[in-house]
């Protein structure tokens, strides 16, 4: 089994990269995000690898870090999600953004990924809602909201407040942290307008 490749980029295509390791070219299928951040031909590269072995083929999937690889594995536990769909999701959302989307039941955000319809996005959010915190990475805002709301899904005012703050230019983590602080002050029954107002107050400190 191959767990990591360290070599020189020989080729970058639409859905894969070829990494030259001591004269041997390894084809690794990657998300669009990973390919975009990989660098140019001739540059050094490191990819964390998930190896799939079938009777008729061996396929390598490459990731920028181990967290992205863990999300790739986790996503495929969802019914209807294979390697191609998992890569599409990770190409659209970073691990932190995906953790936030699942915690906040933001189906629209997950369905932004190519080939991911509303039903698949709903399954991802529903089936992974209790597993996502362990894979949240740097999504501290998500963790804060989870602590405030418990294991259940975020109510609509919370999701609306996070979305509104994000639309104002704040990152999803900043927005989630601010809304978590607002919830502490206003309580779980606060409407979105109050959460946005208190969230902005928190962000201005």
UniProtKB/Swiss-Prot annotation:
The RuvA-RuvB-RuvC complex processes Holliday junction (HJ) DNA during genetic recombination and DNA repair, while the RuvA-RuvB complex plays an important role in the rescue of blocked DNA replication forks via replication fork reversal (RFR). RuvA specifically binds to HJ cruciform DNA, conferring on it an open structure. The RuvB hexamer acts as an ATP-dependent pump, pulling dsDNA into and through the RuvAB complex. HJ branch migration allows RuvC to scan DNA until it finds its consensus sequence, where it cleaves and resolves the cruciform DNA. Belongs to the RuvA family. HAMAP family: DNA_HJ_migration_RuvA (MF_00031). InterPro entries: DNA_helicase_Holl-junc_RuvA_I, Hlx-hairpin-Hlx_DNA-bd_motif, NA-bd_OB-fold, RuvA, RuvA_2-like, RuvA_C, RuvA_C_sf. Residues 144-152 are annotated as: Flexible linker. Keywords: Cytoplasm, DNA damage, DNA recombination, DNA repair, DNA-binding. Pfam families: HHH_5, RuvA_C, RuvA_N. Has three domains with a flexible linker between the domains II and III and assumes an 'L' shape. Domain III is highly mobile and contacts RuvB. This is Holliday junction branch migration complex subunit RuvA. SMART domains: HhH1 (SM00278). Residues 153-205 are annotated as: Domain III. Residues 65-143 are annotated as: Domain II. GO terms for cellular component: cytoplasm; Holliday junction helicase complex; Holliday junction resolvase complex. The gene is ruvA. Homotetramer. Forms an RuvA(8)-RuvB(12)-Holliday junction (HJ) complex. HJ DNA is sandwiched between 2 RuvA tetramers; dsDNA enters through RuvA and exits via RuvB. An RuvB hexamer assembles on each DNA strand where it exits the tetramer. Each RuvB hexamer is contacted by two RuvA subunits (via domain III) on 2 adjacent RuvB subunits; this complex drives branch migration. In the full resolvosome a probable DNA-RuvA(4)-RuvB(12)-RuvC(2) complex forms which resolves the HJ.
């Amino acid at each position: 089994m191959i767990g990591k490749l360290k070599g020189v980029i020989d080729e970058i295509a639409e859905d894969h990269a070829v990494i030259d390791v001591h004269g041997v070219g390894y084809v690794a299928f990657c998300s669009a995000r990973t390919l975009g951040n990989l660098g140019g031909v001739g540059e050094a590269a490191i990819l964390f690898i998930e190896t799939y072995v079938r009777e008729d083929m061996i396929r390598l999937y490459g990731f920028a870090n181990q967290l992205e690889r863990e999300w790739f594995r986790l996503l495929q536990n969802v019914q209807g999600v294979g390697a191609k769909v998992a890569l599409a999701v990770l190409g659209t959302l970073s691990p932190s953004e995906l953790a936030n989307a699942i915690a906040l039941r933001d189906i629209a955000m997950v369905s932004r990924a190519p080939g991911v319809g509303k039903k698949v996005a709903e399954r991802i959010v529903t089936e992974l809602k209790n597993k996502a915190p362990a894979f949240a990475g740097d999504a501290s805002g998500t963790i804060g909201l989870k602590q405030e709301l418990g294991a259940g899904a975020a109510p609509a005012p919370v999701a609306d407040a996070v979305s509104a703050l994000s639309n104002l230019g704040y990152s999803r983590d900043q927005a989630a942290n601010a809304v978590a602080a607002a919830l502490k002050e206003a309580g779980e029954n606060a409407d979105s307008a109050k959460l946005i107002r208190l969230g902005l107050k928190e962000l201005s400190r």
